[in-house]
């Protein structure tokens, strides 16, 4: 039987190829990576495309503090597909990876590594430990990115801790300060008691917390306008009713705010009178479970109560009744507990009343101070319960409702934060907000809803708090007059600090005294003195990464400003997209990017967020080990990444089947090109059969569709076009019906089919090259070559229809 089979086989032209059916990507990919590294693939590609128009995709720097995850993989692979495609589309598209290397997470890990010694080490020693930690993770993450097939200048990444970067960042700060956009002032800011530092809006995440919402009554003490007497209400039995969800802020209460446009009623309960917004009386009474009450007299405009006085609920002080437009009728009582030291609206309205003090009875660790009286020393969260218990016992609490609400948390430690008024450095967004709007309009946003999202965020944001009370970062380059305390920033001081940092790095700020840094001859503009101290704060890390348009795009010779594209996840609208936009508009008057492309989050197969505790996470290393990096790349291309992208073992298993069909299409063609020399064996178009011309027309359609997909970064469209072409047009039809010609003859019909298949495979391989970077190169290595074809498929030009 075997003999007969052998005799039969000899009469057929059966496919022959060493291109394996089983991909074996986990073993093959590292071999290819070594070849790319040995042959300096990235730099050779840049040299190959020298002189062509540039396409600059500027890399947003990931934080250098751990292994990559599926979200990072999604991000880097999208970028790599774009870079590879652009380099095949007639551009020189360099890719300079970057790393964000300063900030609290690294500092906390550094402190943890020294244990009990952390109290004994100097700031300079701590910074050196931080730098070592960051640089170690840069190498780890770079290797993980390269394992995904990402090509770029990983030998020379940009790092926010490099002296030349820090120097340029200081210059950006100086340019903004010179224009009046930087100032220092007392304002309530997001404050993390656990990290003991101020936070920016971009560093806040919201989570659901339980809390007690309470209605508290404050006893009226003075009625200078005679409002109560006018309406026959006894002052000694009258109270303002406020509502709050932050009981711990009551020690800081200095005012009660009403809205002058609302009407307020006197609500009699027993023989006592309670002032609250007329429209909210019923809801307050219901919440307090009070059934027997009476509204006395006619409603009174809120304006009539202005500058009345009341006694604090337990401290020996009086507060003021003031007016503010931020008071609404959506909840509460229409009388807002106002603590200017612990809320932005509170602070702003208190600024209109100089007689109202700003009190901050909370220290940087979240503990109440002596200003809180008997509660001094209690953490604010614990104080909630003790203050509530005491006020309930004293009769000050009218009602209490246990609720769940969205509350801000620190995105670093994930613990609840507080608002706390402190002296901080700010960037005054209000001064150049209109310029930012104009810059937003010049940018192409993908998806286009990004335009309105960014505009809305800029419209709604307060001034940017750019100072942090930590050690690992770029210092605020400000000096203070020892005599009068006025801060001092001039062109000369900025240049001195920038030059020093460029030479020695920002560690120099901690090595030298102020007099050793500040230029000779500088005098205080206020008092004329010339003795100085240095600022002790560092800049927000978003100011670091927000300076890359200057420190990287303008400084690296292979790049340019503005970038053609910034591409990151949707969270960067409040992060890197925005900080870059603000610093660029403030310093240069324009956006740092021509276009912004945004992707969604990676979620599990059910659409839920991935959490280690839930056991629903998938690590890139696991998928690479089981399937290879090309399957992760195919997952990226097959997804609509503009929304949340699902990932899971079942999804990757299905994708491996789709990959196998694409691979087997290539393998079948390679097998039938055995012995085919495209330099001598290709036939003219007029010698092709009708079915061959149909196949080439289908190829033209594929090129049109994939070209359109790549042009708008719709890789999902590219993937589906390729998959359908391989499965439907090729495997199910053309390759099937041409088997007789291929297997049974050696004449013109076979040559025509081989010519057609060769053209198809060359084009198909180039089309999939940006996505399946490993498999496309493997196919390319096995493919018969014509003169002028490059060793690496990524050096080729993307095929065009016609």
Regions found by a protein language model. Name each.
Residues 49-52, 60-61, 94-107, 157-165, ...:
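Short, solvent-exposed turn/loop segments enriched in Gly/Ser/Thr/Pro and often Arg
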Residues 83, 90-102, 264-309, 503-506, ...:
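Carboxylate/His-rich catalytic cores and anion/metal-binding grooves
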Residues 47-109, 169, 242-251, 257, ...:
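N-terminal catalytic cores of NTP/NDP-binding nucleotidyl/phosphoryl-transfer enzymes
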Residues 2-25, 31, 35-39, 111-251, ...:
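Residue patterns forming the tRNA-binding/recognition surfaces of aminoacyl-tRNA synthetases
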Residues 359-368, 592-599, 603-604, 644-654, ...:
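Substrate-binding beta-hairpin/strand module that engages nucleic acids
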Residues 100, 189, 193, 200-207, ...:
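Acidic, turn-prone loop/beta-hairpin segments
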Residues 2-4, 84-92, 113-123, 143, ...:
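Secondary-structure transition/capping motifs at alpha-helix termini
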Residues 222, 319, 353-366, 470-472, ...:
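Alpha-helical recognition segments enriched in aromatics with Gly/Pro capping
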């Amino acid at each position: 039987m075997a003999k007969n089979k052998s005799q039969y086989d000899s009469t057929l032209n059966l496919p022959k190829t060493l291109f394996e059916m089983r991909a074996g990507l986990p073993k093959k990919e590292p071999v290819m990576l070594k070849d790319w590294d040995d042959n300096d693939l990235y730099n050779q590609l840049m040299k190959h495309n020298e002189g062509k128009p540039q396409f600059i995709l500027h890399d947003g720097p990931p934080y250098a503090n751990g292994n990559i995850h599926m979200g990072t993989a999604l991000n880097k692979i999208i970028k790599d597909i774009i870079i590879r495609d652009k380099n095949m589309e007639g551009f020189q598209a360099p890719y300079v990876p970057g790393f964000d290397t300063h900030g609290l997470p690294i500092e906390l890990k550094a402190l943890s590594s020294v244990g009990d010694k952390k109290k004994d080490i100097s700031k300079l020693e701590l910074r050196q430990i931080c730098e070592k930690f960051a640089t170690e993770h840069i190498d780890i993450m770079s290797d993980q990115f390269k394992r995904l097939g990402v090509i770029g200048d990983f030998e020379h990444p940009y790092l926010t801790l490099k002296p030349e970067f820090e120097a340029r960042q200081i210059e950006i700060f100086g340019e903004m300060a010179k224009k009046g956009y930087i100032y220092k002032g007392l304002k309530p800011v997001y404050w993390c008691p656990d990290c003991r530092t101020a936070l920016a809006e971009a560093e806040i995440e919201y989570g659901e917390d339980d809390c007690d919402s309470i209605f508290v009554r404050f006893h009226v003490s003075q009625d200078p306008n005679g409002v109560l007497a006018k309406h026959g209400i006894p002052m000694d039995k009258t109270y303002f009713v406020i509502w709050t969800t932050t009981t711990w802020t009551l020690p800081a209460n200095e005012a009660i705010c009403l809205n002058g446009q609302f009407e307020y009623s006197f609500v009699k309960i027993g023989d006592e009178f309670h002032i609250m917004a007329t429209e909210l009386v019923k809801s307050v009474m219901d919440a307090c479970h009070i059934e027997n009450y009476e509204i006395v007299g006619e409603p009174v405009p809120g304006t009539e109560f202005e500058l009345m006085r009341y006694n604090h609920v337990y401290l020996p002080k009086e507060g003021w009744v003031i007016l503010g437009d931020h008071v609404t009728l959506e909840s509460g009582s229409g009388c807002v507990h106002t603590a200017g030291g612990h809320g932005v609206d509170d602070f702003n309205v208190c600024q209109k009343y100089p007689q109202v003090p700003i009190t901050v009875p909370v220290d940087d660790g979240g503990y109440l101070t002596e200003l809180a009286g008997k509660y001094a020393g209690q953490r604010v969260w614990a104080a909630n319960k003790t203050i509530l218990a005491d006020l309930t016992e004293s009769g000050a609490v009218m009602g209490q409702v246990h609720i769940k609400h969205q509350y801000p948390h620190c995105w670093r430690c994930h613990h609840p934060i507080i608002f706390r008024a402190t002296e901080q450095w700010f960037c005054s967004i209000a001064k150049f907000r209109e310029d930012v709007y104009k810059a937003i309009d010049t940018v192409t946003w993908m998806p286009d809803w990004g335009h309105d999202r960014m505009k809305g965020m800029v419209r709604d944001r307060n001034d940017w708090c750019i100072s942090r009370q930590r050690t690992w970062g770029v210092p605020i380059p400000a000096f203070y007059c020892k005599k009068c305390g006025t801060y001092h920033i001039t062109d000369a001081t900025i240049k001195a600090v920038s030059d020093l940092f460029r030479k020695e790095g920002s560690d120099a700020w901690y090595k030298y005294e102020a007099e050793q840094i500040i230029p000779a001859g500088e005098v205080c503009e206020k008092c004329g003195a010339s003795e100085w101290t240095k600022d002790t704060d560092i800049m927000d890390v978003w100011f670091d990464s927000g300076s890359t348009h200057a420190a990287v795009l303008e400084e690296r010779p292979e790049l340019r400003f503005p970038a053609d594209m910034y591409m990151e996840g949707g969270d960067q609208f409040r992060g890197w997209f925005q900080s870059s936009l603000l610093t660029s508009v403030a310093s240069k008057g324009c956006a740092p990017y021509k276009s912004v492309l945004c992707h969604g989050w990676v979620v599990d197969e059910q659409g839920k967020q991935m959490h280690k505790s839930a056991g629903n996470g998938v690590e890139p290393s696991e998928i690479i080990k089981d399937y290879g990096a090309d399957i992760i790349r195919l997952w990226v291309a097959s997804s609509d990444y503009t929304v949340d992208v699902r990932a899971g073992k079942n999804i990757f298993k299905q994708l491996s089947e789709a990959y196998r069909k694409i691979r087997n299409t290539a393998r079948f063609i390679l097998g039938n090109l055995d012995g085919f020399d495209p330099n001598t064996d290709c036939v003219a178009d007029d010698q092709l059969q009708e079915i061959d011309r149909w196949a080439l027309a289908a190829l033209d359609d594929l090129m049109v569709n994939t070209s359109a997909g790549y042009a708008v970064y719709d890789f999902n469209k590219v993937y589906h076009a390729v998959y359908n072409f391989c499965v439907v047009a090729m495997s199910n039809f053309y390759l099937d019906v041409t088997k007789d010609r291929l297997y049974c003859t050696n004449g013109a019909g076979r040559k025509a089919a081989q010519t057609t298949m060769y053209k198809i495979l060359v084009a198909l391989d180039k089309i999939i090259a940006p996505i399946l970077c490993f498999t496309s190169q493997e196919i390319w290595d096995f493919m018969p070559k014509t003169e002028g074809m490059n060793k690496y498929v990524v050096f080729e030009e993307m095929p065009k229809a016609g």
